[in-house]
């Protein structure tokens, strides 16, 4: 149905259509009423739109007022007839009543009527207007329950009264003896009634036992949304535009909703209530009600605003963030406590896809993810704020995790599942790292800070896993110097065989960590080999001896590199470590040695003069001055940066 204007709903008045009758005429009219029972109905039929067959009752009036229509003939109704019609709810009486009011005003302006008589007549008119007002506002108070035609009649009456108010205001104050009765402001009264109806609807509470704020908020939101949708769909097509029916209802419901939430916000709220209050204010109300598909076109431009003032929202958000931080901290601490208890009780870790597995990383990731999702369910901005909070809490937790793990490494060595739990915790680092890299999107320096404790945990775990192997290799490496490098190939074969038999112990590590552990083992083999070369127990005075040793070193270097690479070591950076030392030992020209040393120092910036001296000591045919000149080349590289991967800094000489 198209929206009708107030002019469409009310037929124009005819001048002088309802002359005032004296009480004597009214009495006479009563006596004649039986003979002219259809006279009043004939007068009212002019206010009924459309044509009806005789005897057909209108849907907009009581059945006892529906009589046969006989055109426009018949005398105007008296005051008593108007009163009776209004008491029966016949809103058609509004037009004759308005004519009666105008006739009274005209009589007062013309003079000739006593002041007492004017007061008497006006009191009767005002009494009729009270009846009419109550009838009209009664219909408008329950507009969805009224038949559409009757609702249109009530709206037409209010629209007509508003026009009359404007005309009276334009005419200015009169000089007659009548009391001022305009403006009547029925439109304002209707709006007040809308506010009362909204308060009544929103004031209803959910079923008993559901008085918690969460249920009350849901009731308020659902009531407002459903009622406003009904206003848009069923009332807006019937109401004149000047009523602003959607705005009137929306503002009233909004004000009641806001008042209730403001009252709730004054109390000390629990965490759940604070969250639900923010969720409604910042998300559900603006998105699910104001911007709902059926209402967005009507409400978006009204400027209803927020349910709470910005300052109060900020205070609630600060409370929410503080509570969430405390909850996250407590939950993470509890998860770590349970995990550490399982270590101490020698509970074996789970196996997942052939790897030792711990649920700790998953628990922590879920705790932080749920906190962030909870904040983002309010606003994305609050999600960003809690992310900054979590970036403080998470590193603190990881440091606690590292400390707890270190304690376990020291105290749990005799436990049956010690190594399995160490592996499970190393594997945890992968889940933590992947989660941070994929979900946190923080600068690299921040990410490095976050991952720092995990790196320490992993490193200590590797040291623990490799400790027994290192002990087994120690006497094998000493054979190099004990035999004065008489059988270096056979010695290295024993070392490689020992390592090979122990590698299955690390099979339950995640693939990336097996590679890292293999790199650590690769580094250990190269480092220990260099240590044996640097012992100073081997001095070769001839070029042939030096070339023979260099050949042994090259062969051993190739064996180490091939074995470690074959088992997953990614440490290509270690490849030149031993071959270049072999070349320094093989070369006889001090200048050539000097160039080789300079190149070596660029690969390994932690290669110091002390390390160089230990290697040059093998070459017994170099003079002190030649050694000094060769060593001087390292002075040029003194400004080099610290190596990102240490090698020679792990080797003590002197």
Swiss-Prot record:
Keywords: Angiogenesis, Developmental protein, Differentiation. Residues 1-38, 50-78 are annotated as: Disordered. The keyword Magnesium does not apply. Signal peptide: none annotated. The keyword Nucleotide-binding does not apply. Residues 28-38 have a biased composition (Basic residues). This is Tumor necrosis factor alpha-induced protein 2. It comes from Homo sapiens.
């Amino acid at each position: 149905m198209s929206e009708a204007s107030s002019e469409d709903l009310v037929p124009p008045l005819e001048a002088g259509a309802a002359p005032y009758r004296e009480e004597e005429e009214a009495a006479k009219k009563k006596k004649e009423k039986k003979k002219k029972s259809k006279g009043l109905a004939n007068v009212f039929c002019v206010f009924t739109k459309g044509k009806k067959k005789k005897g057909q009752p209108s849907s907009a009036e009581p059945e006892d007022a529906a009589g046969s229509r006989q055109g426009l003939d018949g005398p105007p109704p008296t005051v008593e007839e108007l009163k009776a019609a209004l008491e029966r709810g016949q809103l058609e009486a509004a037009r004759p009543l308005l004519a009666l009011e105008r006739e009274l005003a005209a009589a007062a302006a013309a003079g000739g009527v006593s002041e007492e008589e004017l007061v008497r007549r006006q009191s009767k008119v005002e009494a009729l207007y009270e009846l009419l007002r109550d009838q009209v506002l009664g219909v408008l108070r329950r507009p969805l329950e009224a038949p559409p035609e009757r609702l249109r009649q009530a709206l037409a009456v209010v629209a007509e009264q508003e026009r009359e108010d404007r005309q009276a205001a334009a005419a200015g104050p009169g000089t007659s003896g009548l009391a001022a009765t305009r403006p009547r402001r029925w439109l304002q009264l209707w709006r007040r009634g809308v506010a009362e109806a909204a308060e009544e609807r929103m004031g209803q509470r959910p079923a008993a036992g559901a008085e918690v704020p969460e249920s009350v908020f849901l009731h308020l939101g659902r009531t407002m949304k459903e009622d406003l949708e009904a206003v848009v769909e069923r009332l807006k097509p019937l109401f004149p535009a000047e009523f602003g029916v959607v705005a009137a209802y929306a503002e009233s419901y909004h004000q009641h909703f806001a008042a209730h939430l403001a009252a709730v916000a004054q109390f000390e709220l629990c965490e759940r209530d604070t969250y639900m209050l923010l969720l409604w204010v910042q998300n559900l109300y603006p998105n699910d009600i104001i911007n709902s598909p059926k209402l967005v076109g009507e409400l978006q431009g009204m400027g209803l605003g927020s349910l709470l003032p910005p300052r109060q929202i900020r205070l609630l958000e600060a409370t929410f963030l503080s509570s969430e931080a405390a909850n996250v901290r407590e939950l993470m601490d509890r998860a770590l406590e349970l995990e550490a208890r399982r270590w101490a009780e020698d509970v074996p870790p789970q196996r997942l896809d052939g790897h030792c597995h711990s649920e700790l990383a998953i628990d922590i990731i879920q705790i932080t993810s749920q906190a962030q999702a909870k904040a983002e369910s309010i606003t994305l901005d609050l999600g960003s704020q809690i992310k900054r909070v979590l970036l403080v809490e998470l590193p603190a937790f990881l440091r606690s995790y590292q400390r707890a793990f270190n304690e376990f490494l020291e105290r749990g060595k005799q436990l049956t599942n010690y190594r399995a739990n160490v592996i499970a915790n190393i594997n945890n680092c992968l889940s933590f790292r992947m989660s941070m890299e994929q979900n946190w999107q923080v600068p690299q320096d921040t990410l490095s800070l976050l991952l720092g404790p995990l790196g320490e945990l992993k490193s200590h775990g590797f040291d623990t896993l490799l400790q027994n192997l290192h002990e087994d290799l120690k006497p094998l490496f000493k054979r190099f110097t004990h035999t004065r490098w008489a059988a270096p190939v056979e010695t290295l074969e024993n070392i490689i065989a020992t390592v090979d038999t122990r590698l299955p112990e690390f099979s339950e590590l995640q693939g990336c960590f097996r590679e890292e552990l293999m790199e650590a083992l690769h580094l250990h083999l190269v480092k220990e080999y260099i240590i044996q070369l640097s012992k100073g127990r081997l001095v070769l005075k001839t070029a042939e001896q030096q070339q023979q040793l260099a050949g042994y070193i090259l062969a051993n270097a190739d064996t180490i590199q091939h074995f470690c690479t074959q088992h997953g070591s990614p440490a290509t950076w270690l490849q030149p470590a031993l071959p270049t030392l072999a070349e320094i030992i093989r070369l006889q020209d001090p200048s050539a040695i000097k160039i080789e040393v300079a190149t070596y120092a660029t690969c390994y910036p932690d290669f110091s003069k002390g390390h160089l001296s230990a290697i040059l000591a093998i070459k017994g045919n170099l003079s002190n001055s030649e050694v000094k000149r060769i060593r001087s080349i390292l002075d040029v590289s003194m400004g080099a940066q610290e190596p990102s991967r240490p090698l020679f800094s792990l080797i003590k000489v002197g």
